[in-house]
């Protein structure tokens, strides 16, 4: 039986903002606000670039990631387009 390929929403979201170099605001669980562009990520951390400097941010410390512009993660279904 072939394995069904599924992607989790976190990876789809982070990949979209990485590929599109979308500016983001990241809020950490301690309230600190970081801003920049996500250049890389894995299961545990991401790299955030701003003004030529790169920060390694651990995902367990992140509360919220807010892109500066709207993000469309999935193609709309035929029913959604016709509505």
UniProtKB/Swiss-Prot annotation:
Q: Which domain of life is it from?
A: Bacteria
GO BP annotations listed: regulation of DNA-templated transcription; regulation of RNA stability; regulation of translation, ncRNA-mediated
Q: Which InterPro entries match?
A: Hfq, LSM_dom_sf, Sm
Q: Which keywords appear in this protein's UniProt record, sorted alphabetically?
A: RNA-binding, Stress response
Give this protein's Gene Ontology molecular function annotations.
Answer: RNA binding
Identify the GO cellular component terms for this protein: cytosol
Location of the Sm domain? 11-71
The subunit structure is: Homohexamer.
Q: What NCBIfam families does this protein map onto? A: Hfq, PRK00395.1
User: Which protein family is named in the record?
Assistant: Belongs to the Hfq family.
Function per UniProt: RNA chaperone that binds small regulatory RNA (sRNAs) and mRNAs to facilitate mRNA translational regulation in response to envelope stress, environmental stress and changes in metabolite concentrations. Also binds with high specificity to tRNAs.
Q: Protein name, please?
A: RNA-binding protein Hfq
Q: Which organism is it from?
A: Rhodospirillum rubrum (strain ATCC 11170 / ATH 1.1.1 / DSM 467 / LMG 4362 / NCIMB 8255 / S1)
């Amino acid at each position: 039986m072939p394995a069904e390929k599924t992607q989790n929403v976190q990876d789809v979201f982070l990949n979209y903002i990485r590929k599109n170099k979308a500016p983001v605001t990241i809020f950490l669980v301690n309230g600190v606000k970081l801003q920049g562009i996500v250049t890389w990520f894995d299961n545990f951390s991401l790299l955030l670039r701003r003004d030529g400097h790169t920060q390694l941010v651990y995902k367990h410390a992140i509360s919220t990631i807010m892109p500066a512009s709207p993000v469309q993660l999935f193609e709309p279904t035929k029913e959604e387009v016709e509505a």
